[in-house]
């Protein structure tokens, strides 16, 4: 009779198995929560605790905590290593590929640049990541409306925060966080002078939004409208 092959790796009978290893497995399977989401998750858990004697209230609190943990998830990403890649700064669906003038508050002139826009639904991870490695040379916030982020007018009329990054080679890429119908809070943790590596997390938009990426002149988008983008991994274009 053939013997069952020995399981490779830690197990309950293996000296390598430990609570620490089990914890690492859980951490690898469940993405951590972005710090901006912890108060929301905590509020849901507090509601569940306060209503522990009432099933409906307890369930509502746990459901709210779980939903917020999912919305504010901060999954690990592995950026491409090939030089010159410009990656998606957000998860979501490519909704627009065109040419447009960068936000006026960045004072980059009236020259239209290639633009790739990503729409983030409520089910997407809402952290933003640096599209390239380089130095932050400008950050500008402009108040505005809170219209639906999937409309063409959202890029010009909605509240937004623009991040301008200059690569070591001198090329510039702009990522614009655009507020949406439910997104009433834009968080940008990057400041002028910061050095970012491609794929670094720099911000977050709460509850549905849009991300516009302005590419250097001459860059050709490598994605198509309707394609799903993964922040920090999907290559939008290459530096010219």
From Swiss-Prot:
Q: Which Pfam families match?
A: PS_Dcarbxylase
Which enzyme class, named as a word? lyase
Q: Which InterPro entries match?
A: PS_Dcarbxylase, PSD-A
Per its UniProt record, what NCBIfam families does this chain match? PRK05305.1-3
Q: Which GO terms describe its biological process?
A: phosphatidylethanolamine biosynthetic process
Q: Which GO terms describe its molecular function?
A: phosphatidylserine decarboxylase activity
Subunit arrangement?
Heterodimer of a large membrane-associated beta subunit and a small pyruvoyl-containing alpha subunit.
Organism this protein belongs to: Mycolicibacterium paratuberculosis (strain ATCC BAA-968 / K-10)
Name of the molecule in the record: Phosphatidylserine decarboxylase proenzyme
**What EC number(s) does the entry state?**
4.1.1.65
UniProt keyword annotations, A-Z:
Cell membrane, Decarboxylase, Lipid biosynthesis, Lipid metabolism, Lyase, Membrane, Phospholipid biosynthesis, Phospholipid metabolism, Pyruvate, Zymogen
Q: Cite a GO CC annotation.
A: plasma membrane
């Amino acid at each position: 009779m053939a013997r069952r092959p020995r399981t490779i790796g830690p197990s309950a009978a293996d000296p390598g198995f430990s609570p620490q290893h089990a914890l690492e497995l859980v951490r690898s399977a469940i993405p951590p929560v972005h710090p901006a989401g912890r108060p929301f998750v905590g509020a849901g858990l507090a509601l569940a605790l306060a209503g522990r004697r009432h099933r409906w209230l307890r369930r509502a609190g746990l459901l709210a905590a779980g939903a917020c943990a999912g919305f504010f998830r901060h999954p690990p990403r592995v950026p491409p290593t090939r030089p010159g890649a410009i990656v998606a700064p957000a998860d979501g669906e490519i909704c627009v590929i065109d040419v447009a003038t960068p936000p006026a508050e960045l004072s980059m002139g009236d020259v239209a640049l290639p633009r790739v826009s990503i729409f983030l639904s409520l089910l997407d991870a809402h952290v933003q990541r640096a599209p390239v490695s380089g130095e932050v040379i400008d950050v500008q916030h402009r108040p505005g409306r809170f219209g639906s982020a999937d409309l063409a007018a959202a890029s010009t009329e909605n509240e937004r925060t623009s991040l301008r990054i200059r690569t070591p080679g001198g090329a510039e890429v702009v990522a614009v966080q655009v507020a949406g119908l439910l997104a009433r809070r834009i968080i940008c943790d990057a400041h002028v002078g910061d050095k970012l590596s491609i794929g670094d997390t720099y911000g977050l938009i709460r509850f549905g939004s849009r991300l516009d990426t302005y590419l250097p002149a001459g860059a050709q988008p490598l994605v198509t409208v309707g394609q799903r983008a993964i922040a920090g991994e999907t290559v939008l274009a290459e530096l010219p």
